[in-house]
Each structure stands twice: as structure tokens, then as C-alpha cells.
Amino acid sequence: MVTRDAGMADDAATGSTRTYQVRTYGCQMNVHDSERLAGLLEAAGYQRAADEADVGDADVVVFNTCAVRENADNRLYGNLSHLAPRKRNNPDMQIAVGGCLAQKDKHTVLSKAPWVDIVFGTHNLGSLPTLLDRARHNKVAQVEIVEALQHFPSSLPSARESDYAAWVSISVGCNNSCTFCIVPSLRGKEVDRSPADILAEVEALVADGVLEVTLLGQNVNAYGVSFADPALARNRGSFAELLRSCGSIDGLERVRFTSPHPAEFTYDVIEAMAQTPNVCPSLHMPLQSGSDRVLRAMRRSYRVERYLGIIGQVRAAMPHAAITTDLIVGFPGETEEDFAATLDVVRQVRFTAAFTFQYSKRPGTPAAELGGQLPKAVVQERYERLVELQEQICMEENRVLIGRIVELLVTTGEGRKDARTARRTGRARDGRLVHFALDTPWEAQVRPGDIITVMVTEAAPHHLIADAGILTHRRTRAGDAHAARQCPRSIGLGQIPLGMPSVGQHSASIGSAGCAR
């Protein structure tokens, strides 16, 4: 137990409103959870700190952490060390650590960073406001980790940042046992929401003006086998049925999902994707390795032949679908022959984009105990070869699109060079990032959330350029909301950038991708 100085101020006495920041590391599930954490804090009376504020400028800083890769640990504890002097100078400041790393390291976070005030896990997000109050009142650090899910995150308040796109969680947890992954032990076995609850959430989002939803789960193809409601019968076809049901929601223009698992990917899902107009022609299908021997060691319950068969079926049903993947380089025991097999599959499939990871040894996973851990220099050299090949393929595939007309959902915050290049940015239906030029008459009219069409004029490995002007422009309610700065913030609703993973990234940083399925 870590005690605090007795001089912690009571903001209720001063009348000031405490501000907060939520910093997110890892996968899209963490992004979804961070929306809920922000919503909980706002419902409790906290105010979001200015977007340009540095880490530590807020009264409360929450780190929502990832435990998948070693860099996540280093990044968290580096940031906590950075905050230590600020905490000493401002004892009223509170620091909370949650998420997968907190769930894993519940007994060590405070020993490594004793100035932390709150440690909470993946199953009790809703406890954060109470823990903050308790820590301030008792002047003692609060550690609360529970081992089973208390509430679906989607039942908690949400503070969404996007007027046009939202995450919708369909399940939590995972029933797989990949040897490299610690997530199932931290998030628990899969638990599925009822279709009625999911569709009600989607309909509420659309009523708020949202145009695109991403259905989110650790393994969406297993949806329907572990319903939380015991009255619902196990149904292997539930995910395909859910996609088709989303297709009947008036005003919902784009549906995405992530992530499926090749072992459980079935043809009824492919049919639903192809036959449901608002389901986007994009598929993120983790491969991890092109070697059957390595897949077996990873405990991935499929082999390359099955994977390629799925890709063939998808391309037959949706010839222009963008297919993205996850790849791990340097898994223990991986030989040059194994790695060459991965390169062969990459050449065959021609992924639109790939999240490429160097294997990271994680304590608590079976892979950490395997022999044949590879030298970093070998892993780095293979990684560079894989990235070079995928970059080449990305460029070739994107060049094919020059001259094509594409529909874009205009976004905000995705074009880092937009101001310098006098361009704006949108996402095509297949998930590709497109930077487009604004004609002077259009500049004030096009808002994030609006729909436009443009012609592709240039290509790069991770984006397209459309400098021939805007061909058509359709104003939307999402655009109206953005223009009015009235982002919907609702109980039980989800958020944020357009579908994951984003086409336009070839390698996964620890801050954007996290756990690979």
C-alpha cells in the first residue's frame, strides 16, 4: 500500500472542474474502452483537457495499456517516469493505469512507479471514477483488479470524438490459445452480446448521424457460440446474420468488422459481405506466418492451404476487395525456409496492406518458453525484407487505381500533411486513405462526415492522391454535426476513426495496432 501526502486539495471546495486525459496504447479494443473511460469521467463531472495539452497537464491522466509487446511496457513506464516530477510538484494530480498491462502486472505497477494513484484492469472499467474519489479521500493508492467481466463496455457512458464513425463491440474475450498471445488470459473467455443489443446500439448511432460502424471483437467469426444471455441458443451463423441485419438499417452507409480468424471463417460470411450493399469490400484476415510448421507452433488452428482457399473465395465473390493482414517475423524456431514460405504467400495474395510485427517475447505466454529464440539481428533483417516486399506490392496495387473514380467519407485528423499540401483526406469504401485537393469553391462546403467522389491521379504505397478536383459532394447529418461542433456523446455508444485496421500502414506501431489475431 502506498500512502499519499495529506495536503491533497478538495476541488469541491474551490469550485474548479478537474480535467482529464486518456492515453491509449494497443489494439482497437483498447480504443473502444478508452471512449468508455472518457465517458465515465465526463459523466462524473470531469472535463476533457485541451487536445494540445501535454501529457501531465491534466488533473487526471489515465493510461489504457497494452501487454502484447515489450515496447508497450517500456513506453508506459517511460511516460510514468516523465510524470514523476510533475506529480511531486502537484500532489493533487492523479495518475491511473488500466488495461491489459495493468491486469497482467497488477502486483508490480506500484513497485515500479509508486507515484501512480490507481491501478485497474480490463474487467472493471466502470470502477474508475469511484477509485479516483477513494484515492483522493483516503490518500492511498487504489488497486482493483477483477478476474471476470462485470459489464459489457458498451453499457457504459461514452465520449465519442467522431461524428461519422463508431466502434460497436459485439463480444469481449477470446477462446483461442495462440502461443504468442497473452490477451485471452487478460480479457478472459469470449462472451457475446445479443444481436438485439448490438442492433439497437447501431440504430442509435445512426440516429445521431453516424454513417459507418466497425463491429469489434477479438474473433468476430466465433460470434454466436458464447452468448451472455443463457436464453439465446448457440448459433454458428450469427455473425453472417448480424451483417445482413446491419444491411437493413436505413442511413447506415458503411459496415466494417475486425478481426476474423481464418480457422472459423465460413462461406456464409463471404456471401453476406458480397450481398449486403453497405458492408465494405475490405477484409482484415490475419495470416501471422506462411509456414505450416510455424503456424502449428503458434497454435493457429489453420494451415496455409485453408488460408489461401478463403482468400480465393473472397476474391471470387468480391473481386475488388482490399485484403489486409497481420504478420509476425522471427517466431521462435523460424528458419529461413519458413520465412521464405511467408514471402511466397505474400506474393500470392498481394495484400493491400500488412501490419508486420517482429516477434516479442512475452512472459506468461507458451512461446516465451520455446527453444530457438532468434537473434535480434536475424529478425530485423527478415523484417526489413518483408516490409520491402510488401511496400512494392502496395505500390503496384495502388497504381492500378489511377484514373478510377472513388467514393470517400471525408475524415479529420488522418492527413498529417494536409495543411502543408492544401489537401484534405478521406477513406474509400475499401479502406484506402485518399488525399484530395480542394477547389476554392468547395473549401468551405466539404466537412468531415460528408461524402464526395474524386478521381485518383497519383499513388503511393500507403495512400492515394486525387488532385483533379471534387466530382460530387453530398452533405450529411454527420457533416452538419461536425460543423456545429456538436459531436454526439451518449450513454452506451461507441466511436472513432474509420474502420480498423487502416489501409495505409505497412507496419504496426505499438500505439496503433497492439494485439494481432
From Swiss-Prot:
Swiss-Prot/TrEMBL cofactor(s):
[4Fe-4S] cluster
In terms of SMART domains, this protein maps to:
Elp3
Keywords annotated in UniProt: 4Fe-4S, Cytoplasm, Iron, Iron-sulfur, Metal-binding, S-adenosyl-L-methionine, Transferase, tRNA processing
Residue positions annotated to bind [4Fe-4S] cluster 1 are C27, C66, C100
Q: Which SUPFAM superfamilies match?
A: Radical SAM enzymes (SSF102114)
- What reaction gets catalysed by this protein? N(6)-dimethylallyladenosine(37) in tRNA + (sulfur carrier)-SH + AH2 + 2 S-adenosyl-L-methionine = 2-methylsulfanyl-N(6)-dimethylallyladenosine(37) in tRNA + (sulfur carrier)-H + 5'-deoxyadenosine + L-methionine + A + S-adenosyl-L-homocysteine + 2 H(+)
Q: Which Pfam families match?
A: Radical_SAM (PF04055), UPF0004 (PF00919)
What positions does the domain Radical SAM core occupy? Answer: 160-397
Which residues participate in [4Fe-4S] cluster 2 binding?
C174, C178, C181
Q: What is its EC number?
A: 2.8.4.3
The cofactor note reads: Binds 2 [4Fe-4S] clusters. One cluster is coordinated with 3 cysteines and an exchangeable S-adenosyl-L-methionine.
Question: Annotated Gene Ontology MF terms?
Answer: 4 iron, 4 sulfur cluster binding; metal ion binding; N6-isopentenyladenosine methylthiotransferase activity
Places the protein is found: Cytoplasm
Subunit field text: Monomer.
Q: Show the PANTHER family listed in the entry.
A: CDK5 REGULATORY SUBUNIT-ASSOCIATED PROTEIN 1, MITOCHONDRIAL TRNA METHYLTHIOTRANSFERASE CDK5RAP1
Family affiliation: Belongs to the methylthiotransferase family. MiaB subfamily.
Q: What does this protein do?
A: Catalyzes the methylthiolation of N6-(dimethylallyl)adenosine (i(6)A), leading to the formation of 2-methylthio-N6-(dimethylallyl)adenosine (ms(2)i(6)A) at position 37 in tRNAs that read codons beginning with uridine.
Task: Give the protein name, as stated in the record.
Answer: tRNA-2-methylthio-N(6)-dimethylallyladenosine synthase
